[in-house]
Amino acid sequence: MPSFLQEHCLQLSRVIPPNICEEIIQIGKDTYTEYGQIGGSEEGIEDHYTRKSGVAWLDRDAKLSDGLTIFDHITPHVRQVNEEFFKFDLSFHETYQFTTYKYDPDRKEHYSWHCDGHHTPYTEEECKNDPLINERLNTYRKLSYSVNLSHPDEYEGGHFEWTDPFGLNPQTMTPDNITYRAEQKAREQGSIIVFPSFVYHQV
């Protein structure tokens, strides 16, 4: 059973088998990686103050050694959480984003405070390169999730933190209210953190 992380995020601990996590990591490494961008369009911008991390876009239908796809392994768990707790009307699933955070002596890789949700529906410009454009157009991102593919002994830092839905102070871009940090079991390999896309969070 999933357990609440405070009141805005839910975790499922170790639901993806370690060997499947390692396979997904290898697929990510074999896929072209670029610096993650910010902004709501296909022509986003690189802003390393806000976001410095590697990003690759994964084929959700890529077959793994057990004959199932990445999509098959992850989305049933997320759907169950949504059906039991959040109850969003979900109409489509976006492309998987494989993100890496590497140690940099000058500036550690990170993704500072942000929310995934759009305040306006997706436009044709934003969807033009998406094969699922007809499903995505004029919709909103409602539910987000983060899958921890790495074993906790293999890295330091990388803490998932979030604040309440009131979000950030627009002057300081920092939370006015309490900040929460995911507990250790959310860092276990194969764990998933599920949260509404309007929740501000950082890594």
Question: Which sequence ranges carry the predicted segments?
Answer:
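Fe(II)/2-oxoglutarate oxygenase catalytic core
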Residues: M1-V194, F198-V203
